[in-house]
Design a protein with these regions (language model features):
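Glycosyltransferase catalytic domains, chiefly GT-A lineage
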Residues: 1-300
């Protein structure tokens, strides 16, 4: 069970039964987290963002959260019992810990966000999305909600002929490869579901086949039993590119951009900020606004 800490006003997070959460294990993604938090507040969300940190998160990171009154909660660093090699993409080692929100039973609803996201439109409606009650223990047909992953035979391709509906409806959970993207997950925490997840992590014959860590596990454990969200809630920046899924992308409809791949916007230096991708310019505009406001408040 995760424990509240004094690194920031945990009472703010504890006072809410519905929260946004984001995983942070080091300071590499800290600029993203700070700007994500700012963007949620900017669009008027009624719910706090709680930073879920592991033992590796350093003191300077905690200080940054404290200075901005961002609640924080310690979680264990999850890994499968048998080592899974992700040396070609080491970020997947951290991704197992994105399963921790299922354990946070002190909350009624958790919406897990990746720290490399930026919210442009209020999406508090996700806190009211119909999901199975935790009393069903993962045996229902709406265990959690997420968007689809985007391999070459992605489910989003099935929506190209009707881009208008793609703004409000997700492709069926079984469409394409039936694999979710773990960047945004809507969860009703449940001890029973979390125990199912932990049991799979102890099963090498299963985890050895999970190329995408947490999202592979959830897709395998709950095949077709999750609610597919429209892309606007987890709009991978690459979807906007010509030849990917530009047929359905609508700038004015997107609620949350996910800055997958490298470099991240905050990694751009020396006058290159936002030069490589239009969506990166969007991030820098909001980030610079955050920095200006923090400067006025004496936060450096």
């Amino acid at each position: 069970m995760a424990e509240a800490t004094a690194t920031s006003p945990a009472a703010e997070g504890a006072a809410h039964k519905n929260v946004w959460t984001t995983l942070i294990t080091n300071c590499d993604y800290l600029p993203g987290l700070l700007t994500l938090d700012y963007s949620l507040k900017k669009v008027g969300s009624r719910y706090p963002l709680v930073a879920l940190y592991t033992d590796s998160f350093p003191p300077e990171g905690h200080a940054a959260l404290q200075a901005r009154n961002i609640p924080a909660k310690h979680i264990p660093y999850l890994l499968p019992a048998a080592h899974k090699d992700y040396s070609n993409d080491t970020r997947f080692y951290d991704c197992w810990s994105k399963l921790a929100p299922f354990s946070l039973v002190e909350y009624d609803r958790v919406v897990q966000l990746d720290s490399d996201m930026l919210v442009f439109r209020n999406m508090d409606e996700l806190m009211e999305l119909e999901l199975d009650s935790s009393a069903l223990k993962g045996e229902g047909s709406r265990v959690f909600a997420a968007s689809h992953a985007t391999p070459s035979n992605c489910a989003l391709t099935t929506q190209h002929a009707d881009p208008a509906s793609a703004q409000t409806q997700g492709a069926p959970a079984t469409a394409g490869l039936g694999v979710l993207n773990g960047g945004l997950q809507v969860v009703n925490p449940s001890t029973a579901i979390y125990e199912k997840i932990l049991a799979v992590l102890q099963t090498p014959s299963a985890t050895s086949n999970y190329a995408f860590a947490d999202q592979s596990l959830l897709s395998d454990l709950f095949p077709g039993l999750w609610v597919p969200l429209p892309y606007v809630y987890n709009a991978l920046k690459t979807l906007r590119w010509e030849g990917v899924h530009s047929e359905i992308w609508r700038d004015e409809e997107v609620k949350n951009v996910h800055y997958i791949l490298s470099p991240k916007p905050w990694d751009e230096k020396g006058g290159e900020e936002g030069q490589g991708d239009e969506t990166h310019r969007w991030w820098w505009k909001v980030n610079n606004e955050r920095l200006e406001e923090e400067k006025k408040r004496g936060i450096i």
